[in-house]
């Protein structure tokens, strides 16, 4: 089964950019007959959405670059390498990477997505007997719990008071839904626990006893060697003194920390993606020897963001096709949601909502996109069926996160750091998809009863 999935993906999964192009054509071809849209309307929806994720694309690029630059700081590299020496066998290394990544992603998806892969690379430097592809796949598999965690965009949006909640749900939700009914609901927490256990056991068992694809640790050290040697010569010019002034780095870092304390501590705001970037940036500035050293590390890390910069506009265009409404008054996302509603009852509704979100996620891999597409339809239908709105929201959230395991879009930062192709890890992730799918479906059915 494992070999079959790995070979299937390696044979048929194209480069992520080609995958995005194919998804664009599939969405367009499906939207025309189902939504009665002309090719011109579809092109207009696509073109109108292409630039809608520019700010988010910049954030994702900064998460990758700032996280990588932070990992290149000498003190951070020493700490990560010390942790990487803890596992005493290849299966133990796989298990540790999976658990660390999942817990970090549950706390904050941007933080976990980067830290998990950096930790996996550190283990690969320490252990020459671990399968590198499976190690990186294990780090990425922890991402499946992100939307059930405390940085999940849909449950956080549902918990935010204001008129926008009623507008987004067509009046189905007028009062905010507290986190105790979504992320912190015991059903959800048990599902998270079983999912983490499931992927940890699965990833550990998938490690081959023979024929593991390993990588020369020296290659990883060369690739990670972002920091350059500080010149031993005495600085003579004012410019050189400024470039090597630790004071400048610390002043800027302290400004970032002060803002975070005010924003998170005093005002009680949540830690969003911008906050994660600020933390990475502040720590990077403080932990690199000099400002110019950080600039050089940042510049070398930037090359890994090419895939993100190129592909985000295409997925934004796909989102435009999915959400675009033509003269018929319906969108492709609405058609899929309506089909789900027609065959549902109060018990199966959360499960079918989850599956609907999972399919949509292949075309719109964004929590915000899911909220825009499904919230107006699914919460209204859920209210008519007397389904708990917290359960409806978490069904959408789990569906959004689940198929990320086989959607290369979110793997781009991890693949850039690991210097692998999507086809190298997606075969293992396909196994995790099947296992977690059973766990999540069972959990949603039990929650609905």
What are these regions (language model features)?
Residues 32, 56, 60, 68-73, ...:
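Transmembrane alpha-helical segments of multi-pass membrane transport proteins and ion-pumping complexes
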Residues 1-65, 184-197, 201-311, 431-434, ...:
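Hydrophobic transmembrane alpha-helices of multi-pass small-molecule transporters
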Residues 1-5, 38-46, 71-87, 122-132, ...:
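Flexible loop linkers connecting adjacent transmembrane helices
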Residues 90-105, 129-153, 157, 170-180, ...:
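Alpha-helical transmembrane segments of multi-pass membrane proteins
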Residues 53-164, 363:
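Early transmembrane hairpin of solute transport permeases
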Residues 86-119, 309-326, 337-380, 384-385:
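Hydrophobic alpha-helical transmembrane segments of multi-pass integral membrane proteins
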């Amino acid at each position: 089964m494992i070999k079959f999935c790995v070979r299937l993906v390696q044979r048929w999964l194209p480069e992520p950019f080609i995958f995005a192009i194919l998804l664009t054509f599939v969405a367009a071809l499906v939207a025309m007959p189902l939504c009665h849209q002309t090719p011109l309307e579809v092109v207009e929806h696509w073109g109108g959405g292409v630039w809608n994720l520019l700010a988010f694309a910049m954030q994702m690029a900064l998460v990758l670059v700032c996280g990588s630059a932070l990992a290149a700081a000498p003190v951070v590299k020493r700490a990560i390498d010390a942790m990487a020496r803890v596992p005493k066998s290849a299966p133990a290394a796989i298990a540790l990477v999976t658990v660390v990544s999942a817990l970090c992603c549950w706390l904050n998806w941007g933080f976990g997505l980067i830290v998990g892969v950096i930790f996996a690379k550190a283990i690969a430097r320490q252990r020459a007997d671990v399968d590198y592809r499976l190690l990186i796949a294990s780090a990425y598999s922890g991402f499946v719990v992100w939307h059930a965690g405390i940085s999940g965009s849909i449950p956080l949006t549902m918990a935010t008071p204001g008129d926008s909640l009623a507008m987004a749900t067509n009046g189905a939700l007028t009062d905010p839904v507290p986190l105790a009914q979504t992320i912190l609901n015991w059903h959800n927490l048990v599902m998270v626990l079983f999912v983490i256990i499931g992927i940890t056991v699965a990833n550990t068992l998938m490690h081959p006893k023979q024929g593991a694809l390993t990588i020369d640790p020296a290659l990883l050290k060369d690739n990670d060697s972002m920091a350059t040697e500080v010149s031993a010569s005495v600085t003579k010019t004012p410019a050189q003194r400024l470039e090597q002034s630790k004071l400048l780095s610390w002043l800027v870092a302290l400004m970032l920390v002060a803002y975070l304390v005010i924003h998170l501590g005093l005002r009680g705001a949540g830690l969003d993606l911008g906050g994660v970037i600020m933390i990475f940036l502040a720590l990077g500035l403080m932990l690199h020897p000099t400002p110019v050293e950080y600039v050089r590390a940042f510049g070398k890390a930037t090359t890994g963001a090419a895939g993100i910069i190129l592909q985000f506009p295409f997925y934004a265009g796909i989102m435009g096709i999915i959400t675009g409404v033509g003269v018929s008054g319906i969108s492709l996302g609405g058609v899929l949601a309506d089909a789900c509603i027609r065959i549902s009852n109060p018990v199966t509704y959360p499960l079918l909502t989850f599956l609907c979100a999972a399919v949509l996620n292949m075309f719109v891999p964004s929590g915000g996109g899911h909220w825009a597409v499904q919230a107006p339809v699914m919460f209204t239908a859920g209210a008519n069926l007397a389904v708990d709105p917290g359960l409806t929201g978490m069904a959408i959230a789990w569906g959004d996160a689940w198929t990320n395991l086989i959607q290369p879009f979110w793997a781009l930062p991890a693949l850039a750091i690991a210097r692998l192709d999507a086809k190298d890890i997606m075969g293992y992730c396909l196994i995790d998809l099947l296992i977690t799918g059973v766990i999540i479906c069972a959990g949603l059915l039990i929650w609905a009863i």
